[in-house]
UniProtKB/Swiss-Prot annotation:
Main location per the UniProt record: secreted
SUPFAM superfamilies in alphabetical order: Scorpion toxin-like
Species per Swiss-Prot/TrEMBL record: Lucilia cuprina
Protein known as: Lucifensin
Gene3D superfamilies: Knottin, scorpion toxin-like
């Protein structure tokens, strides 16, 4: 979700990572389909 909302290369990945950190994950990244994928 966070990947579609923000345009720009680094910003959306940071928002995705922050979203995942808040959920207790180690971070996350945006895949090729603009989906935020959290790391375990």
């Amino acid at each position: 979700a966070t990947c579609d909302l923000l345009s720009g290369t680094g910003i959306k990945h940071s928002a995705c990572a922050a979203h995942c950190l808040l959920r207790g994950n180690r971070g996350g990244y945006c895949n090729g389909r603009a989906i935020c994928v959290c790391r375990n």
